[in-house]
């Protein structure tokens, strides 16, 4: 999404758009069709005279550009524009092909509409945020271009682009749909998948530090439960740990018949935050798969209203703009990521708590105890951030509030849910960054860098290149930020 350039569309794509537009142009001549010759929402009972039809399309854009709050980051706006474009390419909206081409130019040239975060109730889709996008397509409002917020008109002129001129229903088509929540959701999913990979890797490295027995990730144990996610997480852990000299084989020690101790010095079973990784992250994996399915379905759907269908020669009125699928999925996604974050926070606690791990100095402090403090204060950040994730995990899906003269008497709140999931994911990266800082410091405390698995060694070396071992106290906020950048790079290749 961040760097993509969309190709010029194929003839079949253009043909589908033209067929839809031409059919609607003829079909709508002598009929009452919502949003073409009627008002919008509860004002649909009012007929619009022919001489005002074009003005009607401009009015919905200008009247609904009422967002508030911080601007949505450019990456997420770009994703929303791609999602809206895909809706039009279904050929069910009756829009002129020039609209799709102009959106493509915006995306490819990095012209990103200013879109405030707040305003959508998720039905009729993301009206307010999409109106801000539509406002720029008609040459009004503001855009971000080459790092600067500017008036749209000057940016269009600079790029030799003309504002879009309304034909039949393009004002309604741009504003009416689930594209903002879907775009945010897709970016959320990409970051969440990357985060899950790190959670797996960090968990392997934690067990290397603890010198755990490795049977908790074995195929026979995890195959005894019929959950794809659990089995896949265990497989990923087995792949990561290959070549490690740190983890232990139960068969070589506890099963060799030579133990006569009354009290075992090494843990027979480690804490749940080390041992139950497949069972904890398995549902997260399964949820990511389901979220991917829902978002792919949504982006390849016509989430407009009404739906223009040249095949059946009809126009259908309904509610494809309703964002329930995305809303429900974003709620589930933030719950999954919060659980992942809670796991990371507990692993941090294991590393930092010398009376629990029994092998490391307090807070992986390699300096003078009492005089120096290691990563002690970073735990405050991880704990408070995890707590925020837990609160944000309460669902938006069931927080419908009637509005719009009760025309929208039950809504999805899908964009709110997607934005909350975005915050949860960002928080999770902060906690994961602190965990990875603790892990590499622990590896140096124990002097086991040459014994961990080759994959763990690669990560260790990459991190130590920008976060060297430390003994003296220095501010760590910049290192946390650098670690987050590293974690988001996308170095994993999923099967």
Spans of model-derived segments:
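Generic structural signal for alpha-helix starts
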Residues: 49, 73, 96, 453-454
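C-terminal auxiliary extensions adjacent to catalytic cores
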Residues: 1, 5, 9-27, 53, ...
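Glycine-rich, flexible loop motifs
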Residues: 1, 5-30, 57-116, 207, ...
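FAD-binding core of FAD-dependent oxidoreductases
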Residues: 34-48, 52-56, 63-88, 116-138, ...
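Well-ordered mid-protein domain cores that form the structural environment of catalytic cofactors
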Residues: 71, 89-112, 119-130, 135, ...
């Amino acid at each position: 999404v961040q760097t993509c350039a969309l190709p010029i569309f194929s003839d079949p794509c253009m043909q589908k758009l033209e067929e839809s537009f031409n059919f609607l142009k003829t079909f709508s001549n002598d009929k009452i069709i919502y949003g073409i010759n009627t008002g919008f929402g509860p004002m649909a009972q009012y007929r619009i005279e022919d001489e005002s039809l074009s003005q009607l399309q401009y009015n919905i854009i200008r009247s609904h550009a009422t967002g508030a709050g911080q601007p949505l980051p450019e990456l997420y706006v770009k994703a929303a524009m791609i999602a809206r474009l895909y809706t039009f390419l279904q050929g069910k909206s009756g829009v002129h092909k020039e609209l799709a081409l102009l959106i493509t130019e915006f995306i490819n040239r990095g012209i990103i509409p200013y879109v405030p975060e707040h305003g959508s109730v998720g039905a009729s889709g993301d009206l307010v945020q999409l109106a801000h996008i539509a406002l720029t397509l008609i040459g009004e409002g503001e855009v971000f271009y080459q790092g600067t917020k500017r008036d749209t008109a000057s940016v269009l002129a600079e790029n030799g682009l003309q504002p879009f001129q309304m034909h039949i229903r393009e004002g309604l088509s741009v504003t009416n749909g689930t594209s903002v929540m879907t775009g945010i959701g897709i970016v959320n999913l990409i970051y969440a998948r990357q985060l899950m990979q790190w959670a797996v890797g960090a968990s392997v490295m934690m067990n290397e530090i603890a010198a755990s027995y490795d049977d908790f990730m074995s195929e026979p144990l995890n195959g005894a439960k019929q959950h794809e996610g659990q089995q896949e997480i265990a497989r990923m852990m087995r792949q990561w740990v290959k070549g490690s000299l740190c983890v232990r084989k139960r068969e070589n020690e506890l099963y060799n018949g030579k133990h006569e101790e009354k009290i075992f010095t090494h843990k027979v079973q480690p804490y749940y935050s080390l041992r139950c990784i497949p069972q904890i992250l398995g549902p997260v994996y399964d949820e990511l798969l389901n979220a991917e399915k829902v978002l792919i379905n949504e982006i390849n759907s016509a989430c407009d209203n009404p739906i223009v269908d040249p095949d059946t020669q009809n126009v259908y009125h309904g509610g494809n703009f309703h964002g329930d699928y995305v809303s429900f999925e974003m709620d589930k996604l933030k719950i999954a990521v919060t659980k992942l974050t809670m796991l990371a926070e507990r692993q941090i606690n294991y590393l930092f708590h010398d009376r629990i791990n029994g092998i490391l100095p307090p807070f992986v402090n390699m300096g003078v105890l009492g005089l120096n403090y290691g990563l002690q204060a970073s735990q405050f950040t991880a704990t408070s951030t995890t707590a925020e994730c837990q609160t944000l995990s309460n669902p938006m899906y069931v927080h419908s509030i009637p509005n719009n003269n009760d025309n929208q008497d039950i809504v999805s709140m899908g964009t709110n849910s997607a934005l909350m999931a975005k915050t949860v994911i960002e928080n999770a990266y902060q906690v994961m960054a602190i965990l990875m800082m603790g892990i590499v410091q622990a590896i140096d405390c124990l002097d086991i860098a040459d014994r961990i698995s080759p994959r763990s060694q690669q990560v260790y070396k990459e991190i130590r290149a920008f976060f060297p071992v430390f003994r003296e106290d220095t501010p760590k906020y910049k290192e946390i930020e650098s670690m987050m950048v590293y974690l988001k790079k996308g170095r994993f290749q999923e099967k």
